Amino acid sequence: MKKFLSLFFTSVILSGMCGICEAKDMRFVQISDVRYSAGSDNQTFANVIQDVNKQKNVEFVVFTGDNLNKPSTDDLDGFIKEAKKLNRPYYIVIGDKDVNKLKHLSKVEYVKYLKKHIRKYKPETPSYTFIKDNIVFIVADGAKDVIPGTNGYFKEDVLTWLDNELTKYQDKNVIILQHFPIIPPSEKEAYYTFKPEEYMKVLAKHNNVKAVISGHFGVNNEQSVRGVSHISTAGIPDYRIIDVMDADTPNPTIWAQLKQAE
């Protein structure tokens, strides 16, 4: 009987250890505020791409807005050509500098251009969802293309959609990717998001959001608010390597590592 119990407890311990061993980690890279300008020196962007390509175990790269210096297809075309040099899949968020209906580059036109010029680019709208290693990534669009400005604005339909997506994936860990921070990383009122409290009400209804990753302010900052990591990254040459450790557990650890390309 003692031998049986000994074997039983040994089996339980080994099973638990295997469970720990199988805990998954995943890594992605955030690049923000590239501000690509056709006809200008964009070597810094090229250096960042080269640096990111050297990093190991990166699942994907996300560009979190202000990808262009101004809303033009020339800038967008140059940005895409450089981004295509990445050796990992990449996703694109729209920022305030990227779109302007009066400049013939609305958000609809921007997405159409991406789909036309990037093979296998799947998103059909500025806001979209994708899944990597059982983690749900939600791209939330807060840009304005009718009256562009530096203040982010997450419209009611975007917040309703976000609420529905968080409900749909309530049993999964979620990371939100966007250009405009909800929690200001510095005191720049001209960059604040309009009515952030409405966005925070949506977050308060759910416990599956682990991080909100953004750019826009030109500031590197990390802070935790109500259990959610709010990570803001400045423009190039800075970028972040973000590790989600124990990604398949209810409480993963988010580790954001700041890097700078030379």
Question: Regions from the language model: what does each represent?
Answer:
Residues 23, 144-153, 169-214:
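Active-site-proximal segments of metal-dependent phosphoesterases and phosphodiesterases across multiple
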Residues 30-32, 60-66, 90-96, 140, ...:
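Active-site neighborhood of phospho(di)ester-bond hydrolases with catalytic His/Asp-centered motifs
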Residues 8-16:
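Bacterial N-terminal signal peptides
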Residues 26, 59, 127, 134-135, ...:
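Alpha/beta-hydrolase fold active-site loops
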Residues 36, 69, 144, 182, ...:
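Short, glycine/acidic-enriched loop or turn micro-motifs at the edges of active sites
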Residues 20-78, 125:
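N-terminal active-site segment of His-dependent metallophosphoesterases
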Residues 73-163, 168-169, 198-208, 222-257:
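Extended active-site neighborhood of metal-dependent phosphoesterases/phosphodiesterases
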Residues 1-4, 189:
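Positively charged n-region of N-terminal signal peptides that target proteins for export
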